[in-house]
Amino acid sequence: MSVHKLYNTITITIIFISNMIFGQSYIDNLKFKPIAENVSQRAITSIIKDQKGIMWIGTQGDGIYSFNGHELKNYIHKWGDKKTLNSSGVNTVFLDSNNNLWVGTDEGLNLYQRDLDQFIRIKFDDLNSRNQVRAIGENEQKKLLIGTHGSGVFELDTSNQKVEVVKVLAYDNISKLQINDIKTTPRGAILFGSNIGLLKYNSLKNELNYAEFTTLSQPEIIKKPIESILTKLDGNIWLGTTNEGLIKISTSPTNYFEFKNYTITNKRILSLETDRNGAIFCGTENDGLIILDNQGTVKSFRFNKSDTNGIKSNSIWSVFIDDESRVWIGYFNQGVDIYDNENERFKSIESIPNKDQSLFSKSVTSITQDKKGRFWIGISDGGVDVYDPKKETFTHLLNQDNTIAKGLKSSDVVSVFIDSNQNTWVGTWNSGLFLLKKGYKVFENIQIKNSNILKSNRIMSFAEDSNGRIWIGSFLTGLYSYDQKSGTLKHYQSETYESLYINSKNIRKLIVDHQNNIWIGTRTGLYKIENPDSKTPKITPYSSIINNSSESRIRGNLLSTIIEDKQNNIWIGTDGDGLCKLNPITEEIKWFDLSENFDHQSIKSIIQTKDGEIWLAGNNGISKFDSVKNEFINYNTQDGLITNNFNKNSNYLSDNGILYFGCYKGINYFDPKAITTNPTPPVVYLTDFKISNLSIIPSEMGSPLKKVVNETAKIKLGHDQNMFTIDYFGLGYTRSKNIEYAYYLEGFETDWNYVKKIRNATYTNIPAGDYNFKVKAVNSDGIWNETPTVLGIKILVPWWKTNVALLIFLLLTLTIVYVIYKFLKVRLVERQQIKNEREERAQDEALNAKKIQFFTNISHEFRTPLTLILNPLEAIIGNKTVELPSDIEEKHTIIYKNSKRLSRLIDELMDF
C-alpha cells in the first residue's frame, strides 16, 4: 500500500500553463544569465558557496571550478600529480562546519588545501581505494559521512583521516546500494536518500537503517528511490524521487508526521533548494525547473529557444540559492546560469522573435497609458501596440483584425499621447496625425492631402494645456493646436512667428508649463511662447541667453527634450552637449558635468517622479539626480538595462509611480523607490603575486610564499625581487563588472591610487624596507569598503648592505690594513737591514781596500829591504872562494832560506 493512501494525504496533479502567474512574486519573471562563457558544458553536479563567499562548481568530467564573480578557475585531475583531484568526474562538493571543502569523485574523496591551493587525496583503505563518492554529510562529532555507489557508507574522522565502515542494516547487497544525498534535519537527524528509500543514521551504533516516521496509525518507512533531500528550518522534510514527484514530510501539531505527495513530474528530481519565502526549487532531469511556493502553487520553467532569458536546458542537475537570494542552476550540458534579483530592479518589455505576445518590433518611440491601465506604445516600424499588464496581452494595432482600433495605417510612429478626455493621438513620421476619439473603434487620419491647415506629415510631439487644447509640434512646419470643442486645427504662422522662423522649425519636444506658456525645443534652440493666440504673442528665444552664459557649451542649440519640474525650472536635454537647468525667472543656467558624476553627452528624455526626483535617459544608460548630494547616480546594462541607448522623448510615469523608458530594444521599467543602494561593499581578495611578471607558486624552491598570497599576512622579498605585481578582485556577483578599486603601498606612497576597474597593481624598483600594500573596492552604488585588504611586504637589503656584512667588511678591512701594516713594517725592517748590510759591506770593502793597499804598500816596503838582504846573502853563499865556518855558513843558509820564503809570501800577497 502506498504512503499517500495510508495517511490520507493529497495527491496534487498540476497541468502546467506557461503564463501561470504568482501575483507580484519575483518567480514570475526569473531571468537567467550564464555566469561565464568558458564554464564547462559537462553536467554540473554540485554548486555551493564557502564562508568566504567563493562559489564552487562541480562537474562530471571537467573537475571543479571556483568562481568569484569575475573569473573561473578550473581544478582537474592531472596524471602523476598527487596534489590534484583523484578524478575529474566530480559528483558532490561539501563544505563542513570548519569551512573545509570536500570533493567526492568517481575515484574517492579529496580535501582542498586553501593555504596551498591544492588537494589531498583521502584513501579509504588499501584494498578498495576507488570509491564512487556521491554524497557527503557531517555528524555531531564533526566526522564526515560518505555515501557511495556500490561501496557502501563510510565515516571519516577528519582529525586523523581514519575511516570506518558504516554498517547498513537496511540492505545487505552493498554493491547495489546507491547513496544519492545526505542531509541533516534541524533536530540533528541525518537522513540518506538512496535507491532503496530514505535511511537514517544512528551515530551511537554507527549504523544505517530505514527512517521510521510515527504517524497516527503506525511507524512507516519510505522505500521509494530518493534522488535528493531538502530539510527546512520549520522541520519539514522534502524528498525528490526518481519518478514519483515530490514528497513532503511535516510534523503535525500532535507531533505526528504527515505525508503529502506532489506529482509535479515523473522525471528524476536531482536537486532541491528553498528560498527565503519558503518556495521549493526542483531541478529535474529533462523536465526543466519546477517551483512550488508555500501556498502549493506550481510554476514550471522549460527551455524555449525564443526566450533568451529562460533556462538553457530542461535537464537541471543542480540548484543552489545563496544567502543573497541568487538562484544558481547547473545544467547537464549548458553550464551554469544565475538569476540575481538585484539585477532585476530594471524590468523590460521586449520584442521576442516568433512570439506574438510581445512587442511588434524593438524600437519604442513613445509610451503612454489610458484609464483602463493599458499601455499604448509607439514603435518605429511597428505602429502602436496596446499592452494590458493585467492580462499580459499585446494587441498590435497594425493588424486590422484587432478588437481595439482599426485604421492605423502607418508603422513609423514617433509619438503617442492620450489627453484628459481619453482621446488617443498618434504622430507619425510620414503619414500625419491619427486621432482615436474615446469610444471609437476607428482612427481618424489628418494629413496634408486631406487638410488645408496641416503642412507636414511628420508629427513629433503633443501637449495639452489647462483648457484642454492639444498642442502639436511638427517637423519643419512649426507649431499647431487643436481645439477639441470645435474640432479645428490651427497653424501658428503669423508675422511674429515668421520673424523667429517658428513656422518652419523642427520641433522635437513641446510642453505646456504651469502658466499655460508653450515651450518648444528645436534643433536651433529653446523658445517660450506667451499668449500664443494673441495678435502679438510674446516669444522669448533662449538661445542667446544660453549661449551667453558663462558655462555655455551648446554648439548649434541642438535640443532633444525639455520638461518643467515642480519648482518650475526648465530642464533641457541636448544632443551632444549634455544637460542644463534653466530658472525662467532669473534666467540662470546650470550645466551638469563630471563634477556631479554626470557622464551623458546626449540626453534623450527627462522625467520627474511624484517625489520630485529627476530621472533621465541618454546615450549612456539611465541616471537619477540626487538633490541631497547634488550628483547623479548612473545605471547601465551592468545594472540590468537592456541597452544604454534610449529613444528621444520615449518615457512615461504611471499613476503608481513606475517609470518607463523606451529604447532601441524595447522598454525598461522600474519602481524608483525600489532602486535602493546596495549597502554591502565588496571584500577584496588577493589572487596572485608576480615577481618580474612570473607568478609565484607557494612552497616551491626559492619561493617567498609559504601559502597562497590571499592566506599570507606578510611576504619577505630579496633585494632583486623588488619589481612585483599583485592581482586582486572585489568579491561580488551583482554587477561585479562595475566594481572599482583603489590601492597604495604604505611606506612608499602617501595617497590612494584610484584605478577604476583595474584589478592589479605593479611596482618597480622599490627600495629595501617594510611596506603595507592596501587595496579596497567600491560597489556599483558607490559604497566603499573602508577596511582594506592588507599584505605586509618586506624587501630585504642586499646581503652586502646588511649589518653582519658591514661588520664583516669592517673586520676584513681592518685585517687587511693590519696585514698591510705588518707587511710594510717587515719590508721596512728588511730594507733597513739590507741598507745596513750594504753599508757594512761597503765599509768592509773600503776597509779591505785600505788593508790591501796597506798590504801592498807594506809588501813593497818589505820587498826592497828583503831584496837588499837576499842579494848579499846569495853572494856570500855563492862565493866559494870564501870559506866560512860551518856554523856561520849554516846560519847564512837559514837566513837565506827564510828570507827567500818571505820573498815568495810577499810576492803572493802582491799578486792577491
Where are each of the predicted segments found?
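Short alpha-helical segment of the dimerization/phosphotransfer core of two-component systems
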Residues: I894-L902
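Conserved beta-propeller blade signature
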Residues: M55-W56, N100-W102, K143-L145, A189-F192, ...
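Hydrophobic anchor positions in the alpha-helical DHp
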Residues: I667, L909-F912
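Short loop/turn segments that connect beta-strands within beta-propeller blades
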Residues: N68-E71, Q113-D117, D157-Q161, N202-N206, ...
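Residue-level "micro-hotspots" composed of small/polar
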Residues: G23-K49, W79-G89, S129, S175, ...
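Primarily the dimerization/phosphotransfer
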Residues: E830-T881, K897, D911
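Residue-level detector of Asp-centered blade-edge/turn motifs that repeat once per structural unit
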Residues: K49-K52, L95-N98, E138-Q141, T184-R187, ...
